[in-house]
Design a protein with these regions (language model features):
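Glycine-rich portal/gate segments that line the openings of hydrophobic small-molecule binding cavities
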Residues: 41-91, 143-150
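Beta-strand/loop substructures that line and gate deep hydrophobic ligand-binding cavities in soluble
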Residues: 87-138
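Short, surface-exposed coil-to-beta transition loops
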Residues: 5-7, 68-75, 96-101
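Short beta-strand micro-motifs in enzyme catalytic cores
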Residues: 4, 51-53, 100, 111
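Hydrophobic ligand-binding cavity/cleft-lining segments
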Residues: 1-51
Length: 150
């Protein structure tokens, strides 16, 4: 299955730990990520000495305001280097997997957040998936900036 790489970054005028702490609660993604409608089945654990959180969520794909498809996705986040980095794996239908790494670098009085995403998707779906991921992640980061700076 082909792999597609995406990268996003944003500067937010808050301490790195504040941004990191906000994103390590999966419920905070509702309202940040425009497709998510809710988060459920949240489970906390540990993997290789790192704290983890696993959960399920639903993405609602709309066309002209009408929900056409609800996509249940499974997510696992490993907090690899708090408060500097965490990694998330997203599993979605049909056999789409996203490996996402967030890094939080203090800069001036705020934080530079960098998101690196590897999208594993069938070639026939790749353009839709990468375009949608790009659109959604840009909105997520802009919403995060707005939420944390106001």
């Amino acid at each position: 299955m082909p792999v597609y790489n995406l990268e996003f970054q944003i500067y937010i005028n808050v301490p790195a730990k504040a941004a990191y702490d906000h994103l390590n609660d999966p419920h905070h993604f509702v309202g940040l990520q425009p497709l998510l409608t809710h988060v459920d089945t949240v489970k906390y654990g540990e993997q290789d000495g790192c704290k983890t959180v696993s959960y399920e969520t639903v993405e609602a794909f709309r066309w002209q305001g009408i929900v056409l498809y609800r996509n249940r996705i499974r997510v696992q986040t490993v907090f690899t280097r708090p408060p500097e980095q965490f990694n998330t794996v997203v599993h979605s239908f049909p056999n789409i997997t996203l490996h996402v790494e967030y890094t939080f670098t203090p800069k001036d009085n705020g934080v530079l957040i960098k998101e690196t995403t590897q999208v594993h998707a069938y070639a026939w779906l790749a353009k839709f998936v990468t375009n949608e991921a790009t659109r959604v992640q840009n909105i997520l980061l802009a919403n995060l900036k707005n939420r944390l700076e106001t």
